[in-house]
Amino acid sequence: MPSTKVAALSAVLALASTVAGHGFVQNIVIDGKSYSGYLVNQFPYESNPPAVIGWATTATDLGFVAPSEYTNADIICHKNATPGALSAPVAAGGTVELQWTTWPDSHHGPVISYLANCNGNCSTVDKTKLNFVKIDQGGLIDDTTPPGTWASDKLIAANNSWTVTIPSTIAPGNYVLRHEIIALHSAGNADGAQNYPQCINLEITGSGTAAPSGTAGEKLYTSTDPGILVNIYQSFGAANGAVATGSATAVATTAAASATATPTTLVTSVAPASSTSATAVVTTVAPAVTDVVTVTDVVTVTTVITTTVL
């Protein structure tokens, strides 16, 4: 085989290997029932793909959204995303297990989840009208040996799955759950972070009243956020705001050095304290509130603590 063909074949195989390493949410489990995600490696090639709760995308290369695209609608639910035709019921306070395809262990980074109220039918919602509030975040777990142990590593260890608890205080309605991994292995370079957003439709039931206004998807991040432009082999800053009070992941502040970020996340009214505790990535401290307030982040993460969930 001529050397030029060998070189071309090597390049193709290298690209295929890289692409194959990236993932997407293929299945969702709620109250013991399984729901298919949007199978981007299968459905786009079918003449009549099934209706699912996952949002369709054109990211057939299993690629990512780069920081240079953060003001583009693709950051909301991935490339050219369109709403899922179905919604899955879940009670406020219930859990949603998101099962990814195999995630590469080299792609270290946080795992973050948001909710946005569709204020109507999620199957026809305009994604640019959605406003997201963060309900769950995992980041740096152990920085003893750089690049450290990350939420992505925890996801891999859990058979490539991540479980999100729906806030017990959230008002009932139709919501989009935006769930993503941000790979930071190349984030020391400008435009090097890699966002892999995934969206599913939920019908949340319950008697909660919390209705935080949230943040538009195109305003969740900037390309120079401390948690986006960062060398994980040296330091880390949390990507975007705090987790809403009442969520499964609570947050607190402890940092040897810190920087502030633009407030983007809202905190809902607090629920009565429970005895449940969860491991929290150190990102911010939210004051006790009785209404919706804005929180300014402390973004440098240096430790992991255990705190009581409200």
From Swiss-Prot:
Cofactor note: Binds 1 copper ion per subunit.
Cofactor(s) required, per the database record: Cu(2+)
Glycosylation sites: 121, 159
Positions with a binding annotation for Cu(2+): 22, 107, 196
Applied use: Lignocellulose is the most abundant polymeric composite on Earth and is a recalcitrant but promising renewable substrate for industrial biotechnology applications. Together with cellobiose dehydrogenases (CDHs) an enzymatic system capable of oxidative cellulose cleavage is formed, which increases the efficiency of cellulases and put LPMOs at focus of biofuel research.
Main location: secreted
Function field: Lytic polysaccharide monooxygenase (LPMO) that depolymerizes crystalline and amorphous polysaccharides via the oxidation of scissile alpha- or beta-(1-4)-glycosidic bonds, yielding C1, C4 as well as C6 oxidation products. Catalysis by LPMOs requires the reduction of the active-site copper from Cu(II) to Cu(I) by a reducing agent and H(2)O(2) or O(2) as a cosubstrate. Active on cellulose, but not on xylan, starch, or chitin.
Protein name in UniProt: AA9 family lytic polysaccharide monooxygenase A
Organism: Talaromyces pinophilus
Gene this chain is encoded by: AA9A
